[in-house]
Amino acid sequence: MELYDTMRTTFAARDYTGDAVSDAVLYKILENARFAPSGGNRQGNRVTVVRDPAKRKRIAELVVPAAKRYTAQGKAGEGPWNSISPTMVTPEDIEATPPPSRLTEPYTSSDVVLVVIVDLKVVASTDQHLDRVGVISGASIYPFAWNILLAARHEGFGGTITTLAAAAEPEIQALFNIPTEFAVAAVIPLGRPVKQLTKLKRLPVEEMVTREQFDGEPFGIN
């Protein structure tokens, strides 16, 4: 596929046909995705390929509490799991909220699941002392995760970068024998999408880019 077409049509695929993602195709996807950049080219990214139905079912079970909170906050008009605005949703509200299947089923309905982790010993977390949640570490892992989806799209497959499993990181680490210095960055289900979307809804450049400062004039061309 042409690069811009791939970028504009790679979406969060959660419904799959059941077609197999062979090891050969998966290897090709990862072989190309590995060229993503990382801080200092230290390449702290690691991947565990999961086909075992029992382990995939366990992932789906482990994300349920995070999915319930995500859904309850969304229904309350809050930004789910945001670290800025304190939630008004009670633990009772969260417990009473059923997790939507779209947040749990992809782990078992996809053909394969990738557990993407990053070695925090080699990541430059330059924002670690700021009074906010850290985001900089992601610069050394999420380009790789996105490359996986771009390569999957090129091969006719799709998936989505899910992060709910991070809320159960100790359990995920135990399930896959992951050392504690590795952070669970994403769990990516992969399969052939039931429907390939071609027109994605995204903000126009003028609504997300400004000139010179945050509240500057919108960036655009005549």
Label for each model-derived stretch:
Residues 29-33, 114-120, 127-174:
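Small-aliphatic-rich amphipathic alpha-helix that forms the alpha element of a beta-alpha
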Residues 1-20, 24, 28:
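Short acidic N-proximal helix/loop "leader" segments that mark the beginning
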Residues 15-16, 46, 158-162:
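Short catalytic-loop micro-motif centered on adjacent basic/acidic residues
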Residues 49-139:
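Glycine/small-residue-rich phosphate/adenosyl-binding loop
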Residues 5-13, 85, 183-222:
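C-terminal helix-cap and adjacent tail motif
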Residues 41-44, 108-110, 183:
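Short, basic and Ser/Thr-rich N-terminal targeting/leader segments
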